[in-house]
Amino acid sequence: MVVGTLAVLLAAGMTMAVAAQAAVSCRVAYAVSAQRPGGFTANVTVTNLGDPVDGWKLSWAFPSGQQVTQAWNATITSSGARVTAANASYNAAIAANGTVSFGFNGSWSGSNTAPAAFTLNGVTCSGGTGASPSPSPSPSASPSPSASPSRSPSPSPSASPSSSPSPSPQPGDAMATVAAMQPGWNLGNTFDAIPDETSWGNPPTTQALLHHVRSQGFKSIRIPVTWSNHHGPAPDYTIDAAWLNRIRQVVDWSLAEGFYVMINLHHDSWQWINGYPGDRTTVMNRYTALWRQIAGTFRDHSPKPVFESINEPQFTGTSGDDENYQVLNELNTEFVHLVRESGGGNATRLLVLPTLNTNADQGRLDALMTTFNQLRDPNLAATVHFYGWWPFSVNIAGGTRYDTNVEQDLVGSFDRVYNTFVSHGIPVIIGEWALLNYDHTRPGSIERGEFLKFIEAVGYHARIRKLTTMLWDAGQFLNRNELRWRDQGIYDLMKSSWTTRSGTASSDQVYVPRSGAITSKTLTLNLNGTTFQGLRQGDTSLAEGADYTVSGDTLTLTAAALTRPAGNRAYGVNATIEARFSQGAPWPIGIIASDPPTQAAATGTTSSFAIPTQFHGDQLATMEARYADGSPAGPANWTTYKQFWDHFQPDYNANSIILKPDFFAEVKDGRVTLTFHFWSGAKTTYYITRSGTTVTGGTS
């Protein structure tokens, strides 16, 4: 199958939640926008060709055993091959001739054949307009989310936990042990790298690195380990002595620094453990052989080494979620029994069990809770991973800001794990968290201020729910060669979030014209329970009244306050002022001089095409692509907004915007209109025409 070019267009009859005999018809477009070994991303668009709809469920059967692992803009459940996507609270209504879209990540093995048919609200796709069966009552409408998510109160857990320091845990006290592990840090892309420690670009781990991480306030370290390439054949699967000794060395170094240390079977999950449903004996023998050796190595260590059974467990060849839950239960249960039977410190060591795909959907959580209820072991913890609302995490579909979608996804995920586990005495470790596209090698993919708001919210919402968080750092946060943070301000706010809230604002940027009069600008303050204390530039406090005013949560910067730090108004950031609050980290506000960006004609190919762009101090936020009929062009054809960096990227040094081969791989011959959105609010329109592998572009 050619990725991204497959679309299934089907007409369906719809049941209506508002009328028993409504005329209904719809069209469904299913497209795979990205495919990788064992995984894929799909997008689904439903066009309502009949009467308005309020409340919908779209169902289909996967013909090749595919499984959904993560969804957005819909709640997806599965039973065997059958999959059902139900509306979110905010997209239940589909107007006549309106559309609704959702997407998901999934797993596949062998082939990734598209579904052959869909049903909507129980009606088989028929291609015509017909009367729906008698509907079920319409669900209650959900209240509209607030427009300012960072100021909205979170849905409270059943009891607000104390913010006082946790006492020293005693052996066998799982809740106290996990609390003592907060905050945690991942030694990512190191021992999980394939095949060796430095294969993915990070330097060898040193005692100096571990000492530095500990000095920055982290109390636990997760050391992901991939064992696949470091053991012998069946039946013993003997781990290479040098590899096991190196793992033990780094664990011991970490313990000497005072860390709790979590180790696991990492990329083994998709390299061979995923085949367990089809070859239970071979996979289980290998799995138990490895854990028997690992458990034996650390049997007599202190309670601070912690074992995690499997990273992001996933399976192929199953009939659906119910079977996935069962096989994961078997592996988790065998892991617990094996470690406990090894004796010594392992008899009471904290063991960490993941949900399916380490996903926080309620079905995954409930399945793992069943395992906990069966095991009745007091020294267990649950783990999930959190990378935020997917469009924001990768900057696609216009997901450029920390908005209500992002906030609701965060709060919903953390509430579910709190209510399922923590409120019942089972501790939870967010074993990995970050944003997927935030990386020092992809500058601008995630706007800095929006990421700061995400960091602040993760820290707060995890803290009040007693969740321990472990930052996924594959080198994008800490420069391991120089032992310094790549962005000190990001670390400072993260550290502050471990103990208190910080105020933020609607933006960390204020744009002023390169020439011409500067006028006053306003920002909305997100106080987050703090009080605003004033503005500073360096060591100088700005004067209330002359330099700024505050009315409610509206901060107004006067023309004089902006003119002075802007200086000669060179393109770009001319100065940074800070908003200070009664607690937490200050909020940076960059004063940026810019003019509207301009672009010029270009020629190239589908493998090499760059648009000459004079940015004039501005920064690119996102790009839209449309065909002449207004439909989305290029990959992810469920949205006009393309994915930052994967489909396009700015090159500020070369004064160009690069359109990637992955973008052109799914662009049809003909004319495409591109709209570039910049953080100042400016937009440019550019036209490209593809003919085979030749591409021409211009502003008209």
Which residues fall in each region the model found?
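Aromatic-rich peripheral "rim/lid" segments of glycoside hydrolase catalytic domains that contact
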Residues: T441-T540, A570-T576, R580-Q583, P588, ...
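Short, exposed coil/turn segments at beta-strand boundaries within extracellular/luminal domains
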Residues: A579-I589, H677-Y686
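N-terminal export and membrane-targeting signals
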Residues: M1-A7, M16-A17
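Active-site mouth of glycoside hydrolases
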Residues: G172-L350, P354-Q362
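Extracellular low-complexity, O-glycosylation-prone Ser/Thr/Pro/Gly-rich "stalks"
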Residues: G13-M14, V18-Q170, A176, S496, ...
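A mature extracytoplasmic/lumenal domain signature
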Residues: S89, G106, N189, V225-W227, ...
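Extracellular glycoside hydrolase catalytic/binding regions
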Residues: T198, N202-P203, A289-R292, G296-R299, ...
